[in-house]
UniProtKB/Swiss-Prot annotation:
Interacts with the Sec translocase complex via SecD. Specifically interacts with transmembrane segments of nascent integral membrane proteins during membrane integration. This is Membrane protein insertase YidC. Gene3D superfamilies: 2.70.98.90. One of its GO terms (molecular function) is membrane insertase activity. It comes from Maricaulis maris (strain MCS10) (Caulobacter maris). Keywords: Cell inner membrane, Cell membrane, Chaperone, Membrane, Protein transport, Transmembrane, Transmembrane helix, Transport. The keyword Metal-binding does not apply.
Length: 592
């Protein structure tokens, strides 16, 4: 089994090296930041919206200004809720100023994360709701440029909803009641009264727009960022890259939602769950910057003259906290809303892992300890399989001298070598595959844990012991400046600085990986031996920029594997490199 297992590890190692190298050196280099500078765009230019009336269009900003200046451009209603603060623009009843109270921009700053930003500022991101009609003469319905009137209320809180009104020249009266819950969900209840004297068909729509790719876009295969939707229970999504390439999506169904998501945050527009709707993703070119849009349009409803229509939709703007998403899904009835989290193709593992991490964090009081506890639990569950693998490795290591003797005896005669080796396996009762097969089920578990930790918002700004203040950021220490003793930052060196950020935890991870390899049977091929000796160094550099929580998990997992493997090998009477090292140290102390 020795060679088979080594080949498996080599293959996995090389695959990981190739994938990580591709991510770092091909996908990683960020494109030059697309600023919201729009001097070339006429102030009167409007954002084309072919399926919506002219009243639904928003004028493009002629220039980019700071966020506070952009917020002062129109009348606003203050939002003050336990989870969000900000304001709502009366122009278009647009939700374009939302900051998240429970999440700060940086670990050293108590400034809330600014999720939604107004037109004219950097990183425009907003959500809104409107109406459209195919009936001739009704082109003045509520849209992006509509000026709503604040009829009642002054500040939007969970206890004090606000009421907006708008009277269209064509004879329709719109009343919109907006409320917000204790988390991130806004409810928009519209009542439309038809005073036009004729029947009119109305369709309600909702949209989320993001101008340009996010400044902090992750561009990692474990993270999905872009437009996504659930339609009839099925997930549909398109990344920012695909949208930028012109990929447009249109799907119809009943029940679901549309949104634009980033690693930790999402803004989503939610139609009436009982109304058929058509969802669409698209990219709208506007000057030097593109607008990415996820939208829906509900099926038209006929409203006779003199009658009214009631309709309720929702907008979610907040953090992708599992408990909040599940609460919205269960209490409000929004279909599969927890799919906003990128569970990956190993969802049947990542879902229980997230649940366990949440439970463990609550019990232990720290997310870092929850990672260690979950890793230990996985090790315990996988112990029977790992025990068989390590036991087989121990037996293989015990017969290494006999295998070397066979290879020396038969030299280049591969056929006789294989026959003699098979006879040896039979005599010693060794199954060459016994150590390889139990390892295979552990591979998806490792990748599922990686996916879980990379997307867990609970890890963001979560501290650990010692110098780790943020588990979602890279280890801040650096070996090249003696871990902060020398006032020098090598990561700023042009071209190579990115690979010089090697902190203490990546080094610990590399040492545990080397220790694990020392317990394995030595490769008979000198080239394989050199590759294995080099892999811990390679992985130390590769994992250096990774989130500290991931590196700590990997180091802890390696340590548990070393401990487990050492105990099993000693039970089989094998002397390990650790034993040899201890023996040499004791011999030196005795002066022998």
């Amino acid at each position: 089994m020795g060679e088979d297992q080594r080949n498996l590890f080599i293959a996995l190692g090389l695959i990981l090296v190739i994938l990580t190298g591709y991510q770092m050196f091909v996908m990683g280099p960020a494109e030059e930041e697309r600023r919201a500078e729009q001097a070339a765009v006429e102030a009167s230019q409007e954002l084309a919206d072919p399926d919506l009336p002219a009243s639904a269009l928003e004028p493009a900003a002629a220039t980019t200004v700071d966020r506070e200046t952009a917020l002062g451009g129109n009348q606003r209603v203050t939002i003050d809720a336990p989870s969000v603060l900000g304001s709502l623009s009366l122009t278009g009843a647009r939700l374009d100023d939302v900051r998240l109270r429970r999440h700060t921009e940086t670990i050293d700053d108590d400034t809330p994360v600014a999720l939604l930003n107004p037109i004219g500022s950097d990183h425009v991101f907003y959500a809104r709701d409107g109406w459209t009609s195919a009936t001739s003469g009704f082109t003045d319905l509520p849209g992006g440029s509509t000026e709503w009137t604040l009829a009642s209320g002054s500040t939007l809180t969970p206890d004090t909803p606000i009421t907006l009104t708008y009277d269209s020249p064509s004879g329709l009266h719109f009343e919109r009641v907006i409320s917000v819950d204790d988390n991130y969900l806004f409810t928009l209840t519209d009542t439309v009264t038809n005073n036009s004297g004729q029947e009119v068909e109305l369709s309600r729509y909702g949209l989320v727009r993001h101008e340009g790719r996010p400044e902090d876009e992750t561009r990692n295969m474990a993270v999905f960022e872009g437009a996504l939707a659930v339609i009839d229970g099925a997930m549909v999504r398109s990344s920012f890259g695909k949208l930028e390439d012109g990929n447009q999506t249109e799907e119809s169904g009943t029940g679901g939602w549309v949104g634009i998501t980033q690693r930790y945050w999402m803004a989503a527009a939610v139609p009436d769950q009982d109304r058929p709707f058509t969802a669409r993703f698209r990219t709208i070119e506007r000057g030097e910057i593109d607008a990415f849009e996820a939208s829906y349009v509900e099926q038209a409803i006929a409203v006779p003259a003199g009658e009214s229509l009631a309709s309720t939709t929702r907008i979610f703007a907040g953090a992708k906290e599992l408990g909040v998403l599940q609460q919205v899904q269960n209490e409000v009835g929004i279909e599969r809303f927890d799919m906003a989290i990128n569970w990956g193709w190993l969802w049947f593992l990542t879902r229980p892992f997230v649940w366990l991490l949440t439970m463990l964090e609550g019990a232990l009081g720290q997310f870092g300890l929850a990672i260690l506890a979950l890793t230990l639990m996985v090790k315990i569950v996988m112990f029977p399989l790992a025990n068989r693998a390590y036991a087989s490795m121990a037996k293989m290591k015990a017969v290494q001298p006999k295998m070397a003797e066979i290879k020396e005896r038969y030299g280049a005669d591969q056929q006789k070598q294989q026959q003699a080796l098979m006879e040896l396996y039979k005599t010693e009762k060794i199954n060459p595959l016994a150590g390889c097969l139990p390892i295979l089920p552990q591979i998806p578990i490792f990748f599922a844990l990686y996916q879980t930790l990379f997307n867990a918002i609970e890890m963001r700004h979560a501290p650990f012991f010692g110098w780790i203040r943020d588990l979602s950021a890279a280890d801040p220490t650096n070996i090249w400046n003696l871990f902060g003793l020398i006032p020098y930052d090598p990561t700023g060196i042009w071209l190579i600085g990115g690979v010089l950020g090697i902190g203490a935890w990546p080094i610990i991870m590399g040492l545990t990986m080397a220790a694990q390899q020392a317990l394995n049977p030595p490769p008979p091929d000198p080239m394989q031996a050199r590759i294995f000796a080099f892999l811990p160094i390679v992985f130390t550099f590769i994992l250096a920029p990774f989130a500290a929580g991931l590196v700590i998990y990997w180091a802890w997992n390696n340590f548990l594997s070393v401990l487990q493997q050492y105990i099993i090998m000693r039970r089989h009477g094998n002397e390990t490199q650790v034993d040899k090292l201890v023996a040499r140290l004791l011999k030196r102390d005795r002066g022998d």
